[in-house]
Amino acid sequence: VHFLPAFNGLGAPYWNSDIRGGFYGITQDCDNADLTTAAFKSICYQTRDITELLNKNNIKINSLYIDGGMTANKTFCQLLSNTLQANISKPANIESTALGACIVSQIAEGFSVKDIKLVLEDVYEPDTSSEEFYTKDYLLWKDYIHRTISNIKQ
């Protein structure tokens, strides 16, 4: 099962505001776990789209720092690591917007960015044996996107 999270179109690298989201590959045997996993994978695959663009421009991503409420889900974090085949670091404070505001105020008061220490809660390492599976699955997800785009009336 695959999910296209195009509630208001898709951003980079597709830049198509007309595409709409949906689930693909649903059968009568699918359950909530399949749909949830498909939604998680779609976020991971969107991230992979961006990291592949960076790689094409000679910017190699060996690790990624993540934040936000979704990072409280360990399954998602490991899935992202497996999908990207990169280390995923999660800080103890997952609310980076508030932390960013604090950092800006500290800099305004004369503190250096070097004075601010990031405390990591977890580092997720990729399961290298899953690389082939996630690469094939990612390419299938991209195929669903391209098929959906090709069906949009001009």
Write out the residue ranges for each language-model feature.
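Glycine/Thr-rich phosphate-binding loops that ligate phosphate moieties of nucleotide
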Residues: 1-154
